[in-house]
Design a protein with these regions (language model features):
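Signature of short aromatic-glycine-proline-rich micro-motifs recurring in repeat-based ectodomains
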Residues: 247-249
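Beta-rich carbohydrate-recognition and catalytic domains
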Residues: 1-32, 37-188, 192-243, 253-259, ...
Length: 286
């Protein structure tokens, strides 16, 4: 099916209640999945631009724009190499890191042959270089990174089949699986260290993590056992429809709470526009 032409809108607020939107990226293609990165002097917006008419046939490119004054934005340029998609850049030890996925396999390749996720590093948020390959195959894509301390990095990966989270030690050249493998896929993963606890969110099915809300899809909240990689379910975020949901963003606020944003949409219907709301909530860590 054909894909729509989206653009990237940034919203700002001084009280997290009243928001002012403005467009920061609008190319001739379908712009989607924006990610923010704040450095000392700039605010970067990375977004995936889908090139082509068909969703399955379209190729991707990550574009970047930035501001130094909060009002004027640079023209979007390629953030890295054509075909790579950035997922949630992180600041660590004076530099910036991002997991970038690319699929260079031919269309006829099997699921096991599709996909590769690489770890990239930048000193300024604009120029990136490859550090290592995090994983390959199994249609790997969206990968959330969380730094535990001065030497440990965990990657939680969206794949067609389930896989254990991976861990790497500085300088992050090699990756090893943690012991536990979840019994569900990690769709739209988001992980953050809040105090000394890793909180994690992804899209889940209510048949596995049941509640009394409508529909079948949920934005699940978990705590991670960093020794084993096990994800302990805590609760599901509120939903109006249980249709198209998730893609959370988690912002730690001190050591005992976090802001979490996610979208809550009506069930997908081919060729029809459906309502989708952005939700914002506070999680208190006990």
């Amino acid at each position: 099916s054909k894909i729509g032409l989206g653009h990237i809108t940034l919203m700002e607020s001084i009280d997290a209640k009243n928001w002012s939107p403005f467009v920061v990226m609008d190319t001739r293609w379908d712009d989607r999945d924006p990610k923010l990165l704040a450095t000392k002097d700039r605010l970067y917006v990375f977004a995936t631009s889908m090139h082509g008419d068909g969703y399955r046939e379209a190729s991707q490119e990550t574009l970047v724009t930035y501001t130094e004054d909060g009002s004027s934005w640079t023209d979007p340029v390629s953030a890295y190499r054509y075909g790579y998609g950035f997922w949630k850049p992180k600041k660590y030890d004076g530099g910036y890191y991002v997991a970038a996925d690319v699929d260079e396999a031919p269309i006829e390749a099997s699921i096991q042959e599709k996909g590769r996720v690489e770890l990239l590093r930048s000193r300024d948020g604009l120029h990136w270089q490859k550090i290592s390959v995090i994983t390959e195959g199994n249609s790997c894509t969206e990968t959330s990174l969380v730094f535990l301390d001065k030497s440990s990095l965990i990657a939680l990966i969206r794949q067609k089949g389930v896989q254990s989270p991976l861990i790497s030690r500085h300088p992050f050249s090699n990756w090893d699986p943690l012991m536990d493998t979840p019994n569900f896929g990690l769709q739209g993963p988001a992980a953050e260290l809040i105090g000394e606890t890793v909180w994690f969110s992804c899209r889940v099915h209510k048949n596995i993590f049941p509640d009394e809300q409508p529909g079948i899809a949920r934005t699940g909240i978990f705590i991670m056992d960093v020794a084993s990689g096990e994800l302990h379910w805590q609760f599901n975020m509120p939903t109006q429809w249980g249709g198209d949901v998730s893609y959370a963003g988690i912002l730690p606020v001190g050591k005992d709470r976090a802001l979490i944003s996610y979208y809550d949409g009506q069930p997908y219907k081919d060729g029809e526009s459906q309502q989708s709301d952005i939700m914002l909530a506070t999680i208190v860590v006990n």
